[in-house]
Amino acid sequence: MKSLLVLSLFFLSTTASAVTYNLQVLQSLSGTGDSTALALNDNGTVVGNSYNSETAQLESVYWSGGSVTSLGVTGTARGINNSDTIVGETGNLGTAFPVDSQAYSYTATGGVAYLGTLGGSNAAAHAINSSGVITGYAYPTGGNLLQSQAFIYQNGAMTSLGTVSSPTGYSRGHGINDAGEIVGRASAINFGGSEKHLTYWDASGNLNFYNSTSGNYSTGQQINNHGTIVGNGREAATGNTQFGMVWDVNGSLLNVFDSFGGTGNLGSRAWSLNDAGVIVGYGVDASSAKRASVSYDGVNMIDINTVVDLTGTGFVSLDEAHDINASGQIVGVGTRSDGSAGAFMLTAVPVPAAIWLFGSALAGLAWLRRKAIV
């Protein structure tokens, strides 16, 4: 098995260099107003936010068939499943400590439905799985952002996933897989006076707080159906600089993504991954600019700007890759020639079937290993 793993990693790292992408510009609600794509499903429907000049606000939107549609609420859409159910949060995204956010779900037939809170004033939905189970965070009774709690929403009810320390604790749910496993972060004691680290809730809702980095911070962003977790964190040697990281469900740190070329300790982030184990995010280059990235082997990052022809697209750079679906389509945000933020979707040319095949084989090996050690 070890030999197969080494061979597979070699195949992935060498074949990936031949992959290129076509870019689809995801139009804004208002001309060249800012827009950001945050997630997509396997049908190619994309969600995020876009500036509406008529309301002078960022609004939750989805893109389908080349068209952008507002959900009719402010804020942003953050997740979508293959049934086209969308989740997100309303409110002012530019506020560091929002006082007006509400978690919602949206369907084409039912429109926007608010999910409620845990007794407090605010909530935000971050992700939804194939069964329609939602995670995010909400304020408890008498609480605020510094005491928010991760939640699971199913069968019409929101339930707290708890904190490490009660009642002063803090937690957030960011990603969920089809088994109902959730990842995010939590504080050891409270928000301001203790470290915050990767937290994993198993399918039964049991909280596991993992301090597996040498630094004082880590967070999980997404978990795939094989139990691989991606996110970001700090290391003691590099201070407050954050790096993309990969863990298993036992909290073992599998990889830390260096900056492009493995030099400079400039920082990176892993935002999401698919079931083939392909990871997307960004790395910081020598000019301190964010560059959208993809990793086929879970170890090495590729600057997506080097495998996409931006000529005639209106983009000068692709800055962050936020999500990837089963077909390898990638969505994110870049900088347009007028300086505004623009949403994009990338499709591999041709679709690298061999890469997904070998990636799936690797994921299968990881799954077998997981079953042996859990």
Regions found by a protein language model. Give the residues of each.
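Residue-level detector of functional hotspots within protein domains
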Residues: 4, 310, 351
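Generic N-terminal leader/processing signal
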Residues: 194, 368-369
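Short, charged juxtamembrane terminal tails flanking transmembrane helices
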Residues: 371-374
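Residue-level hotspots at or immediately adjacent to binding/recognition sites across diverse folds
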Residues: 18-348
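N-terminal signal peptide c-region/cleavage motif recognized by signal peptidases
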Residues: 13-15
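Sec-dependent signal peptide recognition
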Residues: 1-7, 354-357
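A short, hydrophobic C-terminal helix/tail in secreted or cell-surface proteins
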Residues: 351-368
